[in-house]
Each structure stands twice: as structure tokens, then as C-alpha cells.
Amino acid sequence: MYGRIVYNPTAGPRDAHRELHRVCEELRKRGWKIDIVSTKVRGDAERLARGAAEAGMDAVWVAGGDGTVCEVVNGLVHSQTTMGVLPIGTGNIWAKQL
């Protein structure tokens, strides 16, 4: 199984990066091949998610807030790639409402 974590380093608390690596290690223990990619500018999350879907990755996890989630959703539209959310943003309204 192949997956990607799209991480917004400007979202949420500074210690989220450490937690992100812990999540990644747990996924790897369960047989996932994971890459972590960071966003730098607006639109990166959508582009990175679309690239993962086009590459045939099984899942994309969003590590960020509502804006990052929205971009990844847009990048995965019409794909068969599963999306997961690691809510590390400030508000995380999307994750709370789910």
C-alpha cells in the first residue's frame, strides 16, 4: 500500500511535526509505504494530492487545517484515492463537523 501525507507546516502548533512522524512510523509498521510532502504556497496541497492520485497511491492524509483539507479534496476529485485527515490546524472545523 502506498500513501502520501500532505503536511502544512504553518498550520497549528509547532510540535505537530513530531506527532506527524509518529503517525508515519505507525503507518509504516502496518505495511504502508509513505512519503511526507510539505506545502510551501497556496495550491501546493491540491497539486500534491492530484499527483498522488495520478501516481496510483492508495491514500492521501492531510496534516493541516481546513484550508489544506479543502485543497486536498479538490486535488482528489474524480479519483479513487482515499483521503484521511490529521487535524492539526487551528480551527479544524471540517474535522469537528464530521
Give the ranges of each region predicted by the language model.
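Small-residue-rich beta-alpha loop regions that form the catalytic core of phosphotransfer
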Residues: 2-98
